[in-house]
Amino acid sequence: LINAIIQEITGDQNVITTSRFPGTTLDKIEIPLDDGSYIYDTPGIIHRHQMAHYLTAKNLKYVSPKKEIKPKTYQLNPEQTLFLGGLGRFDFISGEKQGFTAFFDNELKLHRTKLEGASAFYDKHLGTLLTPPNSKEKEDFPKLVQHVFTIKDKTDLVISGLGWIRVTGTAKVAVWAPEGVAVVTRKAII
């Protein structure tokens, strides 16, 4: 963001070195502006509840989008599941058939299946059809933990550091995320 601001103001490109690895800014960077004011880039805050802490360096691209995220809407019936690669899972337990909009990195492959047998499907296909993690990384990946929510209004279900799913109608849902990764709700932002 700061590089984009600097480019807009001065025309200079890539003034600040960026990294997809979290926590690599070591100290405050002070950028002077023509009017005598400054922009400050500060080290980010590392939150242990974010997905990045459970991924290999190669897989950080799934939580650090380089392009604008293209939301994908899925029309789900009750008792359907949406896998978020192998990183998480969304279960539509009950409610009327409705659209759920997923906001995740464009490279993360989402897979729809029936809720019945979804856990066995995950165990069988983690590391192959459901990636990341790949087959070599899956043994070190934390187990998924279920978080159940009853939604009554437009709500985002957020998997910390990965993305979110917008729910627009009344529904009982479950979000599965790696143990240690926070799952929270918020009023829908879009």
Annotate each language-model stretch with its function:
Residues 9-190:
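Helix-rich effector regions associated with P-loop NTPase G domains
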Residues 2-6:
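Post-Walker A alpha-helix
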